[in-house]
Amino acid sequence: MPLEPGDPAPPVTAATQKGERVTVDFEDPTVLFFYPADATPGCTTEANQFDRELETYRDAGVAVYGVSTDDVDSHAAFADEEDLGVTLLADPDAKIAEAFGVEVEEGRAARTTFVCAGGQICGLYEGVRPDGHARNV
């Protein structure tokens, strides 16, 4: 069961598609979107739409991270293929998904998005349709 609004947002340390380790403490406004797999149709749509909205999010002071159970190499290939600027976090052991209570089935995280700020969950979107989701958050 996913964490809910009002729950503390667990800090995350993970590698990006560039192989850099980042730590996100969720004190600042942050969107964390979990998606099942790199380079699949729905996930490609969702990642591209978050990427297109990235400047709007940044202008509002909101960081955006995509998370899947794919590894850094997969994220790098996906980001290069799609020319993505959005930061993708590798979660090959599903530890981030587990910390947020995101269901992982057959090695793939359920499509779930969290809006966080002040170290807590402020919003939760589950079972979303990829098309238009980035704009609706």
Predicted regions and their residues:
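Chalcogenol-based redox active-site neighborhoods
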Residues: 1-137
